[in-house]
Curated annotation (Swiss-Prot):
InterPro entries: SCRL. The gene is SCRL21. Coiled coil: none annotated. It comes from the Eukaryota. Belongs to the DEFL family. One of its GO terms (cellular component) is extracellular region. The lineage of its organism: Eukaryota, Viridiplantae, Streptophyta, Embryophyta, Tracheophyta. This is Putative defensin-like protein 237. It is found in: Secreted. One of its GO terms (biological process) is killing of cells of another organism.
Length: 97
C-alpha cells in the first residue's frame, strides 16, 4: 500500500508547485510608441518600424528587441494622425500603475 500512495502524493505536490508558479506571470515589456500627423502606409507594421527607427533615437540594440509593430490611423478635426506601437521581446518591464 505504501508504494501505491507515494505516486499519488508526488503528483499532488507537483500539482501544487505548478499552480504556485502560474500565479507569478512575467511582467509585460513596455512598448515603444509614436503619435504624429500623417497616415499609415500599406504595409503598416513595416511602416511603423521604419518611422520609429528614423524619428526616435534608439540604439540598434533596442531596435533589435522589437518583436511586432502595429499602426492605427486616426483623424482629429480635419487632420490625419497615426499611432505606431511596437512591442519588445526584452527590456525593462512597464511600471505598475
Amino acid at each position: 500500500m505504501r508504494h501505491a500512495t507515494s505516486p499519488i502524493v508526488f503528483c499532488f505536490l507537483i500539482f501544487l508547485v505548478m499552480n504556485h508558479v502560474k500565479g507569478q506571470a512575467k511582467k509585460k515589456r513596455c512598448p515603444i510608441g509614436l503619435h504624429t500627423y500623417g497616415k499609415c502606409g500599406t504595409d503598416r507594421a513595416k511602416f511603423c518600424f521604419s518611422e520609429i527607427e528614423s524619428k526616435l533615437s534608439f540604439s540598434k540594440q533596442v531596435l533589435n528587441t522589437i518583436s511586432s509593430c502595429r499602426c492605427d490611423d486616426d483623424r482629429q478635426g480635419n487632420k490625419d494622425l497615426y499611432w505606431c506601437q511596437c512591442d519588445r521581446r526584452e527590456g525593462r518591464p512597464c511600471p505598475a500603475n
